[in-house]
């Protein structure tokens, strides 16, 4: 128990150090927040010879990086890496012993345990798929209540992927029967708890209360929806992830197919709703636009 307490404290300290780096990046970039994800995939060539989204240079984590020992170590691509003093240790929770594929590839441990709230910076600055109605915090000044907007969290090793954690907002604020997980699950290695850091710089641990949060019941990579009605953990994350974006329907976002995102160099590269995907706004009651 004493060892778990010590590793839990170390994890919270990692979160605080990463938030210092996060704020330093914003200071150097006119108050902009770093992107939660971008695509970096050398095996795929975009038009004009680009092998990655230009926004990868401004992303917390680039590419479909599982964090489990890919052939290339993507950690140093992170735009936060130099702001941590190139300290690799702060990206890894000492309680994260679940190395999965890394062990098969000869790695002693996964190099990244944390993922970033997709709404804190977005995928290259944009909402992911059907999330157009939800606010993306692109500037530090966008956070009206920074102490209650999480930025980083421990992510389950079976679902850690492209750098971000997407809280599914279906059911917010008052229809808990629609709560669900899809692809992304939080970690629970801190005695069924998870570390979070927030936009004001503080870090805290959340103790999970529901079995669906602790035990993954579907292959995350299959992107299946797991309905988890009345799950208080989902309610807790939704309350701290984002809020509706007023006037989102009037912002003229082109709803492009995800797979065509590389065909045109938009100001921000990113994901839009795929054909046939159920939009998030149809899953929730009409929200109030509170901060």
Predicted features along the sequence, with ranges:
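Short, well-structured segments within or immediately adjacent to enzyme catalytic domains
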Residues: 7, 11-291
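C-terminal juxtamembrane segment of a hydrophobic transmembrane alpha-helix
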Residues: 1-5
């Amino acid at each position: 128990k004493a060892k778990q307490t010590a590793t839990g404290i170390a994890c919270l300290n990692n979160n605080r150090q990463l938030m210092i780096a996060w704020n330093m990046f914003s200071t150097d970039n006119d108050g902009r927040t770093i992107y939660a994800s971008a695509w970096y995939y050398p095996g795929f060539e975009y038009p004009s010879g680009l092998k990655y989204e230009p926004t990868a240079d401004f992303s917390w984590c680039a590419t479909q990086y599982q964090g489990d020992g890919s052939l290339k170590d993507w950690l140093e691509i992170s735009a936060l890496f130099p702001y941590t003093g190139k300290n690799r240790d702060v990206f890894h929770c000492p309680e994260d012993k679940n190395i999965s594929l890394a062990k098969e590839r000869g790695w002693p441990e996964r190099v990244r345990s944390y993922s970033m709230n997709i709404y804190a910076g977005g995928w290259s600055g944009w909402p992911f798929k059907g999330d157009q109605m939800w606010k993306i915090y692109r500037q530090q000044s966008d956070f009206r209540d920074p102490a209650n907007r999480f930025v980083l969290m421990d992510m389950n090793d079976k679902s850690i992927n492209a750098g971000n954690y997407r809280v599914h907002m279906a059911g917010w604020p008052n229809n808990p029967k629609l709560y669900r997980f899809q692809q992304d699950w939080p970690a629970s290695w801190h005695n069924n708890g998870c570390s979070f850091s927030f936009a004001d710089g503080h870090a805290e641990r959340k103790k999970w209360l529901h079995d669906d949060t602790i035990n993954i019941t579907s292959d995350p990579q299959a992107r299946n929806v797991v309905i988890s009605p009345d799950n208080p953990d989902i309610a807790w994350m939704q309350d701290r992830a984002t809020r509706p974006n007023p006037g989102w329907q009037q912002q003229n976002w082109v709803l492009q197919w995800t797979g065509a995102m590389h065909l045109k160099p938009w100001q921000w590269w990113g994901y839009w709703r795929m054909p046939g995907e159920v939009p998030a706004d149809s899953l929730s009651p009409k929200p109030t636009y509170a901060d």
